């Protein structure tokens, strides 16, 4: 744990918020340098949802046929599943960076102790890691949307907003992952968020079938999860079934991400600064 004694900061020509982003940018640049010779690793989590799309969306979709969505809209099963797997792809990018990589930087490599010896503070570290994780999640999203476009799974003009919408998804997942990793003590603890939270969310958040088939109490629990709101938001845009409720999904993801980010910063400060 680093013991930090900071001098009185010198005047800065930038407003506080802009100054924080400029400092956090250094963390992003550092991560880019680290990955410059192993960039293929960034795409590792992209392939899992792609294989699900090919295996389940098309393989199982041949037997399932069409799916009736809210409002009576009928779409092919692959069209129904694809935006949910886009949400999962975004989540994979966020979680891979914020849980795995941040955990090792924090507990083994002691990267942040070294960073705190520079003008950067804990808030700059948290913001920088959030920005980098969102970049990685966005790369996943861009690649997956390109696959959906080639496969003819974007059936609405609203789909042009799918990529901007993934930014709200990545904010929620990146901030949540960053906060979660501060509670993990050993490598074995990875099983807890993945086995008890991430996998159940993936299976039950309307990924493969509408949540209307669940009992009401389970529907309520599912609607509390960020992945459900990400799936519903992206599915509405890519299928054209756009209703005012998408604003609620956006609001939820933005609020969830903001609260999780505040928690992540406080937890990092408690672990790094004495």
Please identify what each model-predicted range represents.
Residues 2-8, 63, 238-241, 251-274:
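Junction motif at the cytosolic side of a transmembrane helix
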Residues 4-28, 217-228:
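Short, membrane-interfacial amphipathic segments enriched in basic
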Residues 11-14, 40-41, 53, 80-84, ...:
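Short alpha-helical transmembrane interface motifs in multi-pass membrane proteins
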Residues 29-48, 247, 273-274:
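Membrane-interface helix starts
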Residues 34, 202-259:
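Membrane-interfacial helix-loop-helix junctions in multi-pass membrane proteins
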Residues 43-44, 186-205:
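Pore- or pathway-lining transmembrane helices of multi-pass membrane proteins that form conduits
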Residues 51-56, 76-150, 177, 196, ...:
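Hydrophobic alpha-helical transmembrane segments of multi-pass membrane transport proteins
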Residues 122-194, 241-265:
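Alpha-helical transmembrane segments and their short interhelical loops
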